[in-house]
Amino acid sequence: NGSGKTTLMNILSGVFPPTEGTVTFNGKECHFSSPSEAEQAGIAMIHQELSLSPTMTAAENVYMNRMPVNKLGLVNYKKMYADCAALLEKLGVSYISPKAKVRNLSVSEQQLLEICKAVSCNAQMLIMDGPTSSLTDTEVKFLLNIVNQLREEGISILYISHKLEEILT
């Protein structure tokens, strides 16, 4: 505790500017002034405190501020729900409905939705801060399987945990 893990993650994800040193990602020095800049560069962050809107659907949360639009500039809900369903299927959690309200999802399902949101941004690096702190042992195993799947797909994972057995998995 107190070693600067969260501060480092916030710098990498564009929440805070570094006061010293540099951030190099994919061989290039980066200066992110916002999380959206880090996201555009391929870095996504999942905070320990989930950042989902409980009154919105799973798909609306995944594509918040990036909802697909049609030629008239209106939200293309059909595409959004289909794209979200495909992402949920890819992660092996197709039992979560893209139309489900987040308030009706369990904590572990919300955590999986946060991962889905990061994957939807084509993240090359996924920063996870204590992702299992409120999950059961069964849910932890499932989440770690998804993390390993993402690693196999070439996504870098920065996984912060106080549980050493998770890090060694």
Residue ranges of each PLM-predicted region?
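Glycine-rich phosphate-binding loops of nucleotide-dependent enzymes
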Residues: 1-169
